[in-house]
């Protein structure tokens, strides 16, 4: 197991696939990281040298907002919506869909959670 920015990467997976398991890094960003490091995306995590791992960790830490930082930002945005009492904040508070979806026949799981 390898940990980068608090995210666990499986050693038996290819680098480009393992990086996509990090919250905030998709397939394109994973390929971009591999390209900038000068490594093939097809080699496995366990085949990387300590230097390559350090370089990857440094690059991801500097250039990309990932994992807990991204989740904290999203949570702060939702709390801000709730604090200013905008439409989206009220819908978040009530546990209802916020992008105009109908609630008469759909969104049942959201409405069940409210009744508890």
UniProtKB/Swiss-Prot annotation:
Family annotation (Pfam families): Ribosomal_S13
GO biological process terms on file: translation
Gene3D superfamilies listed in its UniProt record: 1.10.8.50, 30s ribosomal protein s13, domain 2
InterPro entries with a match to the protein in the record: Rbsml_uS13_C (IPR027437), Ribosomal_uS13 (IPR001892), Ribosomal_uS13-like_H2TH (IPR010979), Ribosomal_uS13_CS (IPR018269)
Principal location listed in the UniProt entry: mitochondrion
Keywords: Mitochondrion, Ribonucleoprotein, Ribosomal protein, RNA-binding, rRNA-binding
Any one of the GO CC terms: mitochondrion
Stretch forming the signal peptide: none
Keyword Transmembrane helix: no
Single Gene Ontology MF annotation: structural constituent of ribosome
Cellular localisation: Mitochondrion
Keyword Ribosomal protein belongs to the record: yes
Listed SUPFAM superfamilies: S13-like H2TH domain
UniProt cross-references to PANTHER family, sorted A to Z: 30S RIBOSOMAL PROTEIN S13/40S RIBOSOMAL PROTEIN S18, SMALL RIBOSOMAL SUBUNIT PROTEIN US13M
HAMAP family: Ribosomal_uS13
Subunit annotation: Part of the small ribosomal subunit.
Family the UniProt entry places it in: Belongs to the universal ribosomal protein uS13 family.
Function: Located at the top of the head of the small subunit, it contacts several helices of the 18S rRNA.
Protein name per UniProt: Small ribosomal subunit protein uS13m
Native source organism of the sequence: Daucus carota
């Amino acid at each position: 197991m390898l940990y980068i920015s608090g995210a666990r990467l499986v050693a038996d997976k290819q680098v480009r696939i393992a990086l996509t398991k990090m919250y905030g890094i998709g397939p394109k960003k994973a390929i971009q990281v591999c390209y900038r490091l000068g490594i093939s995306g097809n080699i496995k995590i366990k085949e990387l040298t300590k230097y390559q791992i350090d370089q990857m960790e440094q690059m991801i830490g500097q250039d990309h907002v990932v994992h807990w930082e991204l989740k904290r930002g999203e949570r702060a945005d939702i709390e801000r919506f709730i604090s200013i009492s905008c439409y989206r904040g009220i819908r978040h508070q009530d546990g209802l869909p916020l992008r105009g979806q109908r609630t008469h026949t759909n969104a049942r799981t959201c409405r069940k959670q409210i009744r508890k």
